[in-house]
Curated annotation (Swiss-Prot):
Domain Core-binding (CB) stretches: 16-121
Lineage: Bacteria, Bacillati, Bacillota, Bacilli, Lactobacillales
Activity: how regulated: FtsK is required for recombination.
PANTHER family in the record: PHAGE INTEGRASE-RELATED, TYROSINE RECOMBINASE XERC
Compartments in which it is found: Cytoplasm
A GO molecular-function descriptor: tyrosine-based site-specific recombinase activity
Known function: Site-specific tyrosine recombinase, which acts by catalyzing the cutting and rejoining of the recombining DNA molecules. Essential to convert dimers of the bacterial chromosome into monomers to permit their segregation at cell division.
Organism whose genome encodes this protein: Streptococcus equi subsp. zooepidemicus (strain H70)
Keywords, ordered alphabetically: Cell cycle, Cell division, Chromosome partition, Cytoplasm, DNA integration, DNA recombination, DNA-binding
UniProt xrefs under NCBIfam families: PRK05084.1
One biological process term in Gene Ontology: DNA recombination
GO cellular component: cytoplasm
UniProt name for this protein: Tyrosine recombinase XerS
Active site positions: R210, K234, H306, R309, H332, Y341 (o-(3'-phospho-dna)-tyrosine intermediate)
């Protein structure tokens, strides 16, 4: 979703929310939570409050009037009834006969509610320095996570990684071959953003930064002499991330055309720009997702920017055999998250041995 549209949607949801949700929104914006995350959470709150009113658990006539005491006194059975409602209600997709929503969606809903309840019962302060209330019913609600071994996850994901020579082959494909498959009109559009697109893909493959971190990069955050980028990690922590040397020519090529191509002025501090109605704007996450999907599908298989992050992590572990180094590169506090890459690399080594 385009940033302007996203912010418009957020304002629409804020206009119907209770005051304490607006407090929550302001607090999380300062962390900072991404606008995308806050938008998804506001959608979940709307669905939850509508259910409270429809189920007569709140006497409010509208969402904005659902009071704190309603949330404070909800029982574990009430929350379980809401989960059952999610599981069994007709799908909102007109073309689907499936009932309910996926477990992933339910988990996202519960995550949003858990975040709100934690804020109301632990983080916020009233005029006496105390939370609004203390009873957190969400701590009693169990979530069901998708069960999948690391080996199974590694098997599913490795086909969507550009390992070995495929990393450079993918960049070369976008640089030299992709446009030959396009119409003349499509070629013009491709050439307009070619340097930028290659710079984005190269940076993701060479650093493993998250999509949101790439979107939020400013010019001051990129040091091509040191091959470092400064990013804001989850939780609002700033971090310096090393970038592999192969990305440098692509980043330099983009910077050489950035000002003239996108009509960038001094106030346009975003590193990656897009032109909208002739004006420079920070590129948004959905545009990068579509761009990466388009190029990767033409090359081999459609992947997301997050798979490019996995690609970097797997290649780095394959070279160093250090989970600590990989976890630092990705911005993880623990090496547990990097266990996946050991399984992928071990599978690749086994496949190589089988070919001897």
């Amino acid at each position: 979703m385009k940033r302007d549209l996203l912010l418009t949607k957020i304002e629409e949801y804020k206009n119907i929310m209770p005051w304490y949700v607006l407090d929550y929104y302001q607090s999380k914006l300062s962390v900072p939570y991404s606008f995308t995350t806050l938008y998804e959470y506001l959608k979940e709150y709307k669905r939850f409050f509508e259910w409270l009113i429809d189920s007569d658990l709140s006497k409010a006539a509208r969402i904005a009037d659902v009071d704190l005491t309603t949330l404070e006194h909800l029982s574990k059975k009430d929350m379980e009834a809401f989960i059952l409602y999610l599981r069994e209600r007709p799908s909102l997709n007109t073309y689907s006969t499936k009932k309910g929503v996926s477990q992933t969606t339910i988990n996202r809903t519960l995550s949003a509610l858990s975040s709100l309840y934690k804020y109301l019962t632990e983080e916020v302060e009233n005029e006496h320095g105390e939370p609004y209330f203390y009873r957190n019913v969400m701590k009693k609600v169990a979530t069901k996570k998708k069960r999948e071994t690391l080996a199974a996850r590694a098997e599913n994901i490795k086909q969507k990684l550009f390992l070995g020579d495929e990393t450079m082959a993918f960049l070369d494909y976008v640089d030299k071959e992709y446009e030959h498959k396009l119409s003349n009109r499509a070629k013009a559009s491709f050439r307009k953003n070619k340097e930028r697109d290659l710079a984005i893909i190269a940076l993701l493959l060479a650093s493993g930064i998250r999509l949101s971190e790439a979107v939020n990069l400013d010019l001051k955050d990129v040091n091509l002499n040191m091959m470092l980028v400064e990013v804001t990690r989850k939780g609002g922590k700033r971090d310096s991330v090393n970038v592999a040397a192969f990305a440098k020519p692509h980043l330099e090529a983009y910077l050489s055309v950035r000002k003239d191509r996108y009509q960038a002025e001094k106030q346009d501090v975003a590193f990656f720009l897009t032109a909208y109605r002739g004006l420079p704007n920070r590129i948004d996450a959905s545009s990068i997702e579509k761009m990466v999907g388009k190029y990767s599908e033409s090359f081999k298989i459609r992947v997301t920017p997050h798979k490019l992050r996995h690609t970097l992590a797997t290649r780095l572990y394959d070279t160093t055999k250090s989970q600590v180094l990989v976890s630092h590169q990705l911005g993880h506090a623990s090496t547990q998250v990097t266990d996946l890459y050991t399984h992928i690399v071990n599978d690749e080594q086994k496949n190589a041995l089988d070919k001897l």
